[in-house]
């Protein structure tokens, strides 16, 4: 019996390329925050969600799986990247099991929800596993500018795709699992229709402060100010995913606290971290200002690179600082902001400090998923060969101008 099951599994895996080729021909269908809310309202229909997801999830999976295969062979050959590929193939095959199932069958709907939970759990370690694959590549082959450029382009799209897939899965499983989260009874899935921005700021600060106090025995205070240009008498609320906002803020607080404490280690007091939350007609902006010494301009873009980290990668059991890691915190935080058409930018003054600004859409109708699509434009990006720059490169040695003197 065991050999028969193995035979069936191998037959399924053999069919994976056919499914990838088919579903990658379709473009993903981005949803707005308002559509997510409508989808999960009191009259939400599990059958409708099932019918949508069994088509949409394969499209999103297949699109990004086509791009994985465009990575340099040296990256694809690393054990960690191969493991991630196997997870994606298995998840696609899991959903294919429901392609012809009857949505009127309650058992089918229950099995589909269980399958989504399995897929979500399978992909829990995708980020650190892919990060390990990049490290394996760097350790073996060193730095290659062309490959680095392609890896940066791919990982931005890959992780953004992952965020979107988990969003779809979380909405379905949280809404249709038959229970309500007692801690957040008014949430629609993972979305808070009335999210208090300052409350999320405080939660993220408290957790980062806990880590900072534990490691450094000190931490900067927090000052929060709100400016509501649409209604000056009301606190600022928005429709958003609190866990996404928390992720961004927690990462920024960790960086700000680490920089502040380390740059003022000889001082008796630490300058506070200041938060400004501003709501306008189009944007909701959150600015975090620290006095952590800042970063040189030439290093700003590096902070968003997956190939660069300001701290050594922590090894299990070594007691490394909890405020550092793979160096993926900022790049992925920016992707969370971009996912619903926002952004995360850094403005630094070396010798003084850094302002980090999170830009989000104020209206739920404007908060639309930003999704990668596999097409000729994406394919061409991976085929691009880095050419010589069209700007002069300053010499590292000062030029001897005496050779140009007229005798």
UniProtKB/Swiss-Prot annotation:
GO biological process assignments: cellular response to nutrient; cellular response to reactive oxygen species; glucose homeostasis; insulin receptor signaling pathway; intrinsic apoptotic signaling pathway by p53 class mediator; peptidyl-serine phosphorylation; regulation of acetyl-CoA biosynthetic process from pyruvate; regulation of calcium-mediated signaling
- Record has Ribonucleoprotein as a keyword: no
**UniProt xrefs under InterPro entries:** AK/P_DHK_N_sf, BCDHK/PDK_N, BCKD/PDK, HATPase_C_sf, His_kinase_dom
Please summarize the record's notes on activators and inhibitors of this protein.
Activity increases in response to increased acetyl-CoA and NADH levels and upon binding to the pyruvate dehydrogenase subunit DLAT. Inhibited by ADP and pyruvate; these compounds interfere with DLAT binding and thereby inhibit kinase activity. Inhibited by dichloroacetate. Inhibited by AZD7545; this compound interferes with DLAT binding and thereby inhibits kinase activity. Reactive oxygen species cause the formation of disulfide bonds, and thereby inhibit the enzyme.
This enzyme catalyses: L-seryl-[pyruvate dehydrogenase E1 alpha subunit] + ATP = O-phospho-L-seryl-[pyruvate dehydrogenase E1 alpha subunit] + ADP + H(+)
- Chief site of localization: mitochondrion
Gene3D superfamilies assigned to the protein according to its UniProt record, in alphabetical order = Alpha-ketoacid/pyruvate dehydrogenase kinase, N-terminal domain, Histidine kinase-like ATPase, C-terminal domain
Indicate where this protein resides in the cell.
Answer: Mitochondrion matrix
Q: Disulphide bridges in this chain? A: none
The family assignment reads: Belongs to the PDK/BCKDK protein kinase family.
Does the record carry Transferase as a key word? Answer: yes
Residues that the record marks as modified (Phosphotyrosine) are 215-216
In UniProt terms, what function does this protein have?
A: Kinase that plays a key role in the regulation of glucose and fatty acid metabolism and homeostasis via phosphorylation of the pyruvate dehydrogenase subunits PDHA1 and PDHA2. This inhibits pyruvate dehydrogenase activity, and thereby regulates metabolite flux through the tricarboxylic acid cycle, down-regulates aerobic respiration and inhibits the formation of acetyl-coenzyme A from pyruvate. Inhibition of pyruvate dehydrogenase decreases glucose utilization and increases fat metabolism. Mediates cellular responses to insulin.
Q: Give the E.C. number(s).
A: 2.7.11.2
Which residues belong to any copy of the Histidine kinase domain? Answer: 135-364
Q: Per its UniProt entry, what is the enzyme's top EC class, as one word? A: transferase
**Could you tell me in which tissues this protein is expressed?**
Detected in heart (at protein level). Highest level of expression in heart and skeletal muscle and the lowest in spleen and lung. Liver, kidney, brain and testis levels are intermediate.
Please provide the record's keywords in A-Z order: ATP-binding, Kinase, Mitochondrion, Nucleotide-binding, Phosphoprotein, Transferase, Transit peptide
| A GO MF label | ATP binding
List positions binding ATP: 251-258, 290, 309-310, 325-330
Q: Kindly provide the name given to this protein in its UniProt entry.
A: [Pyruvate dehydrogenase (acetyl-transferring)] kinase isozyme 2, mitochondrial
- Quaternary structure, from the entry: Homodimer, and heterodimer with PDK1. Interacts with the pyruvate dehydrogenase complex subunit DLAT, and is part of the multimeric pyruvate dehydrogenase complex that contains multiple copies of pyruvate dehydrogenase (E1), dihydrolipoamide acetyltransferase (DLAT, E2) and lipoamide dehydrogenase (DLD, E3).
Q: According to the UniProt entry, which residues carry N6-succinyllysine? A: 376
List, alphabetically, the Pfam families matched. BCDHK_Adom3, HATPase_c
């Amino acid at each position: 019996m065991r050999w028969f099951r193995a035979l069936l599994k191998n037959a399924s895996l053999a069919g994976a390329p056919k499914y990838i080729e088919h579903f990658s021909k379709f473009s993903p269908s981005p949803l707005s925050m308002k559509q997510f809310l409508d989808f999960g309202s009191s009259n939400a229909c599990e059958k409708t969600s099932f019918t949508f997801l069994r088509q949409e999830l394969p499209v999103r999976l297949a699109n990004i799986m086509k791009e994985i295969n465009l990575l340099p062979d040296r990256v694809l050959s690393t054990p960690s990247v191969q493991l991630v590929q196997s997870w994606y193939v298995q998840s696609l095959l899991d959903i294919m099991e429901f392609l012809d199932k009857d949505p009127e069958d309650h058992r089918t709907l229950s099995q589909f929800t269980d399958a989504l939970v399995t897929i979500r759990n399978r992909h829990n370690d995708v980020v650190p596993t892919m990060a390990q694959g990049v490290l394996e590549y760097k350790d073996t082959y060193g730095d290659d500018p062309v490959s680095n450029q392609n890896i940066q382009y791919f990982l931005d799209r890959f992780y953004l795709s992952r965020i979107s897939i988990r969003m779809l899965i979380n909405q379905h499983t949280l809404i249709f699992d038959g229970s309500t989260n007692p801690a957040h009874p008014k949430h629609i899935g993972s979305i808070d229709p009335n999210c208090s921005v300052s409350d999320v700021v405080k939660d993220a600060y408290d957790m980062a402060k806990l880590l900072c106090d534990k490691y450094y025995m000190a931490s900067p205070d927090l000052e929060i100010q709100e400016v509501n240009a649409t209604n000056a008498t009301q606190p600022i609320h928005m429709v958003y995913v609190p866990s996404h906002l928390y992720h961004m803020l927690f990462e920024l607080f960790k960086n700000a606290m680490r920089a502040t404490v380390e740059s003022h280690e000889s001082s008796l007091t630490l300058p506070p971290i200041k938060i400004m939350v501003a709501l306008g007609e189009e944007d909701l902006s959150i600015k975090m200002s620290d006095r952590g010494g800042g970063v040189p301009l030439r290093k700003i873009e590096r902070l968003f690179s997956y190939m660069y980290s300001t701290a050594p990668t922590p090894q299990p059991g070594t007691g490394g600082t909890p405020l550092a890691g793979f160096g993926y915190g900022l790049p992925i935080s920016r992707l969370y902001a971009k996912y619903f058409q926002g952004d995360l930018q850094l403005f630094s003054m070396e010798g003084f400090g850094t302002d980090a600004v999170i830009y989000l859409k104020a209206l739920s109708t404007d908060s639309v998923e930003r999704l990668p699509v596999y097409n000729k434009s994406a394919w061409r990006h991976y085929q691009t060969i880095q050419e010589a720059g069209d700007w002069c490169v300053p010499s590292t040695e000062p030029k001897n101008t005496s050779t140009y003197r007229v005798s």
